[in-house]
Amino acid sequence: MQKFFISLTILIIFIIGAVYGVLFTKIGNSFVGSYIENKVNDEQNDVKLKVNDFTLTFNTINFDASINDNSNINIAGDLKIFQKKVDVKYDIKINELSKLENLTKQKLNGPFSTSGIFKGDANFSEIKGISDIAQSETSYELKLIDFEPKNIDFLVKNARIEKL
């Protein structure tokens, strides 16, 4: 019986070590980054995602990727997994939305960019940002309570819907 508990303890420690190794080490981060890249690229042929950097630690996240060598996604900041707190900045620039049609399942045209912050915890979170959707000057603020939207404010100026 004692051998069983020792074996079980060793197995649990091994599993925890493996999860830690995959999620929070440089080697594990490169594995996860490659997995994300391959998953997106294998499921379709029109868009090529290249993960330039994926770093996840117990306290931070950094995700930097390019799409078709001319569009970028960057997410960086504090991500406290066990405390369920987030304070990240994001910056997304898509040079041509029509190239993403097979992913979005919508016919869209023109460039798109958005940047802002996502800050909060499991009980209350806030997303604030700016965008140029439809060549507009857009600002937005979303408040989430228990990950459910409770307040959404959008201010869109000079939108040119025909360009979308």
PLM feature segments, named:
Residues 1-4:
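Positively charged n-region of N-terminal signal peptides that target proteins for export
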Residues 6-20:
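Hydrophobic membrane-insertion alpha-helices, especially the h-region
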Residues 61-79, 94-109, 126-146, 158-164:
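Flexible, membrane-facing loop/turn or short amphipathic-helix motifs
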Residues 18-89, 95-103, 114-123:
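Terminal hydrophobic membrane-targeting helix
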